[in-house]
Amino acid sequence: MTFIEKNTSFPAPRNDLVRATRPGKVDAYPQDWIHAAQELAQEFAQAAVQRDLEGARPVDQIRRLRESGFVSLLYPKNLGGGGGTLHDAAQSVLEIAKVDGSTAALLGFNYYNSLVPLLTDYTGANDAVVRHAADNRFFWGNVTQYVNKEFVAQHHPDGGYTITGTKKWNTGAPLAEITTLLAIHPDQDRYIYAVIPTAREGLEFHNDWDPIGLRGTDSGTITFHNVRIFPEEVLNWGHSPAQTGPLPLWASFGAIFYTAVFIGRTLGALEQVREWVLRGRRQGSFGGVSVSADDPFIQAEFAEYWVQVQ
């Protein structure tokens, strides 16, 4: 029995893969997030390339992110979170991206979306959602693309909404137990944000994501078939005027986490090249050297790449 099954009445996961991401234990939050991320990266490096070649989903890696508390890093301590900083979060994504781009991207999107209840209202009206997420170490999915203009909610006679439509590029949602949800209000003059379980009846996951290098991010298409959104699942919007565009700081946070993934992947690639060169020997002597690492042309080229990254 997992930690969540012992401590919550949250709906059962939609499949065995999602269930396998549930934490079997709950570690204390790290005192040094970046050092802890480096240790996790060493774990994740095992067979990361093979997982991507096979298109295997990073189930065990998400479970470890939940057990270690990284999924709740940005939540305040008084709400049960890790109390980490934005720098801690971005650097953790970067460290993991050096060895496992898919898992790093999923962690970045988790941070991106775990902040939604805090960004939609600064008065604490959504604190219960944050506490629930922190208590359960939830990994967050993402169903928030603004480009799907036909994704319009309809009023439900008992309150809340129903939604029928399709959303593309839903990073992490297939392996998450909860996800943010962005839809156009029935009046079509503003957006609504909600948080729903991915086991909700009417959700169809298409599993159509297959890009080289980031196959494990699970950013596929989801179709909603008359999916119910209950009133208590709709996040409070505490700003004026009504939400007609992206959340406050949304683009900035996205840029930070995307950049962390890109830089981490680049640093990881350079490290792999360095290791290959250090191990390599030439069949003959060129330019007076027989070891590749001693070749001044290779040294100059590597130095140029390194400077560009910096």
Q: What are these model-derived regions, one by one?
A:
Residues T166-F205:
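A short core secondary-structure module
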Residues T2-Y29:
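Intrinsic disorder at enzyme termini
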Residues I212-Q308:
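Glycine-rich beta->alpha junctions and the first turn(s) of the following alpha-helix
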Residues D158-T162, I178, S219:
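A generic structural signal for beta-strand entry/edge sites
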Residues V49-D52, Q310:
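C-terminal helix-coil-helix/basic helical segment that borders enzyme active sites and/or dimer interfaces
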Residues L40-A48:
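N-terminal capping segment at the start of a domain
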Residues R57-E67, S72-T171:
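Glycine-rich flavin
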Residues V147, L175-E177, R190, D208, ...:
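A generic structural signal for well-ordered coil/turn residues at beta-strand boundaries
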